[in-house]
Curated annotation (Swiss-Prot):
It comes from the Bacteria. SMART domains: S1. Belongs to the IF-1 family. One of the essential components for the initiation of protein synthesis. Stabilizes the binding of IF-2 and IF-3 on the 30S subunit to which N-formylmethionyl-tRNA(fMet) subsequently binds. Helps modulate mRNA selection, yielding the 30S pre-initiation complex (PIC). Upon addition of the 50S ribosomal subunit IF-1, IF-2 and IF-3 are released leaving the mature 70S translation initiation complex. The keyword Protein biosynthesis applies. Residues 1-72 form the S1-like domain. Component of the 30S ribosomal translation pre-initiation complex which assembles on the 30S ribosome in the order IF-2 and IF-3, IF-1 and N-formylmethionyl-tRNA(fMet); mRNA recruitment can occur at any time during PIC assembly. This is Translation initiation factor IF-1. Its main location: cytoplasm. It comes from Cytophaga hutchinsonii (strain ATCC 33406 / DSM 1761 / CIP 103989 / NBRC 15051 / NCIMB 9469 / D465). Keywords: Cytoplasm, Initiation factor, Protein biosynthesis, RNA-binding, rRNA-binding. GO terms for cellular component: cytosol.
Length: 72
């Protein structure tokens, strides 16, 4: 069986939660909970409320995601 591809969406950080989790508002208005990817953690990339980010989401659970990029 092949692995399903993830859905990429852009969003804006609304608030920082505990354990490197964030509440993100997507461009279509939905709010999801997202965590930082491992590469961003290793490179100490800081994310603050108001930042624009790119997220990956599983097609099976659209309420959770992984932040993979922070726009400048």
């Amino acid at each position: 069986m092949s692995k399903q591809s993830s859905i990429e969406q852009d969003g804006k950080i609304l608030e920082a939660l505990s354990n490197a989790m964030f509440r993100v508002e997507l461009s279509n208005g939905h709010q999801v909970i997202a965590h930082i990817s491992g590469k961003m953690r290793m490179n100490y990339i800081k994310i603050l409320p108001g930042d624009k980010v790119r997220m990956e989401m599983s097609p099976y659970d659209l309420t959770k995601g992984r932040i993979v990029f922070r726009y400048k």
